[in-house]
């Protein structure tokens, strides 16, 4: 009798493991992967062994501002941006919690654009971008409960989001090859741009007045500080440079006061245009984001601050950090492709090749009017 019970128990456990394995693989395939930028939850969870030393969370200002190619090639800093477009501070709080649940980085950087906005009014896209890619855990449950309360949703909606029903319900109809095979496993989260849009310097640059932050946002900032401190992980706040309003600058000034009171470094690059060397004629892609040129300047300042403050290790050449090498190569190749693309004619294109690929063999595949090269 006992032997039969033992066999049945083993069968039940094997069945549960089988269902869990199949379910996990299906969720990996059907998972909602579009976070509006950054490296993505699925790449974050796949990190094994050698994790990033620096994690960056926040909105598009996070993944459009800190260039992981520069961080790695020039400083050897292994970073990863876990962000989502238009991310609010409540999402940033739970992102920080998830990082601390699974990793122990040297430092976590939080981009605080949402502190300059109004309240924490979440929309459907916030739910999809931020929560559906997260693994089941107590942290996800708390986040979904918070979203349900924030958006005045009932328990059916809450349970459906936690069970990832939005994934299973409709994703089958929009699957692509990317859902079965990650074509960019090396992506560390930087989403740059070569576009250039010219602006005047914002008048708010020198505004030092502070405007009170929304209480909900103070609560989220406090939560991040407490969580990181409990795990012994340093926290850094930063505001990316953009053409901001007087009110937004005043709220960043309030974040600076909060950070000072809580012994958290805060880099507001909207007070540091000259210090960083930002040029509003060439360093911005649009009114809200820097381009590759501007990102490089901000990243170098950030990297030097991190090295001086936290003594981060140089991981270049270390076994287990090959993805950072590949990501840097990917970003470098994008620069080369762009430089070739903006050539005025084929002669300029050909002149650039030996400069860009010195010591390399270049194969040209020609179609059309071959006589143009004569």
Predicted segments, located by residue:
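C-terminal regions of proteins
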Residues: 249-324
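Secreted/periplasmic serine-hydrolase-like ester/acetyl group-modifying domain
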Residues: 125-233, 315-337
């Amino acid at each position: 009798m006992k032997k039969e019970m033992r066999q049945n128990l083993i069968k039940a456990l094997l069945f549960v493991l089988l269902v869990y394995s199949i379910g996990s693989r299906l969720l990996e395939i059907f998972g909602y992967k579009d976070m509006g930028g950054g490296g993505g939850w699925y790449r974050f969870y796949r990190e094994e062994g050698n994790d990033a030393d620096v994690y960056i969370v926040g909105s598009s200002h996070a993944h459009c501002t800190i260039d992981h190619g520069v961080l790695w090639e020039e400083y050897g800093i292994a970073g990863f941006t876990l962000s989502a477009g238009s991310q609010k501070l409540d999402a940033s709080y739970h992102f920080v919690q998830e990082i601390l649940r699974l990793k122990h980085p040297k430092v976590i950087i939080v981009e605080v654009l949402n502190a300059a906005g109004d309240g924490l009014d979440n929309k459907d896209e916030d739910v999809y971008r931020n929560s559906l890619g997260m693994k089941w855990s107590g942290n996800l449950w708390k986040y979904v409960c918070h979203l349900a309360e924030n958006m005045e949703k009932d328990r059916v909606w809450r349970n459906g989001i936690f069970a990832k029903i939005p994934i299973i319900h409709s994703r089958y109809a929009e699957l692509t090859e990317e859902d079965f095979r990650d074509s960019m496993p090396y992506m560390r989260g930087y989403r740059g741009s070569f576009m250039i849009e010219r602006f005047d310097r914002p008048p708010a640059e020198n505004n030092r007045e502070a405007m009170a932050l929304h209480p909900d946002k103070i609560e989220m900032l406090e939560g991040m500080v407490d969580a990181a401190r409990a795990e012994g992980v340093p926290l850094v706040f930063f505001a990316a440079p953009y053409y901001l309003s007087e009110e937004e600058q005043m709220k960043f000034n309030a974040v600076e006061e909060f950070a000072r009171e809580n012994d958290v470094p805060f880099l507001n690059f909207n007070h540091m245009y000259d210090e960083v060397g930002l040029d509003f004629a060439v360093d911005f892609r649009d009114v809200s984001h820097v381009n590759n040129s501007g990102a490089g300047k901000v990243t170098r300042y950030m990297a030097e601050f991190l090295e001086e403050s936290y003594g981060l290790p140089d991981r270049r050449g270390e076994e287990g950090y090959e993805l950072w090498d590949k990501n840097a190569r990917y970003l470098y190749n994008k620069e080369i492709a762009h430089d070739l693309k903006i050539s005025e004619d084929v002669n300029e294109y050909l002149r650039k090749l030996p400069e860009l690929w010195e010591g390399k063999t270049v194969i040209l595949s020609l179609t059309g009017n071959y006589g143009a090269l004569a």
